[in-house]
Amino acid sequence: MDPPARIVLVEDEAIAALDVARRLRRLGYQVVAVASSGPQAIEYALTRAPDVVLMDIHLQGAMDGVDAARHIQASAPIPVIYVSAYVDAATRERIQSTEAAGFVPKPIHVPTLHATLQRALSGWHSRRPR
């Protein structure tokens, strides 16, 4: 049996982060870190060896989730799935300029989250070096 997929969760709303982390654990994933800012997301993604990063787009502070994802992708081949309640045209364009592994709208629908994670993980495993 494969070990559970390791996830870095990036969410700046504490209650939402706890809820999503709980849902991920119930689905059998291992949440290795919860980041609340872009710089923290980068640090955890590069030091906690996640299989995937679940990234809220709208974060407090100067760096949003798209900028954080760019930094992560420039340093490591880790798939990033974006999460957001609202994405305007400019943000959509910025997302498309990254190698997004998926998008999950808020409020999070658990089957959609699980299916998106599975697609991202299977695609990443087929691309990663052996």
Could you tell me what each predicted segment is?
Residues 43, 66-78:
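Short amphipathic alpha-helix used as the core "switch/output" element in two-component signaling
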Residues 90, 108-119, 125:
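C-terminal output helix
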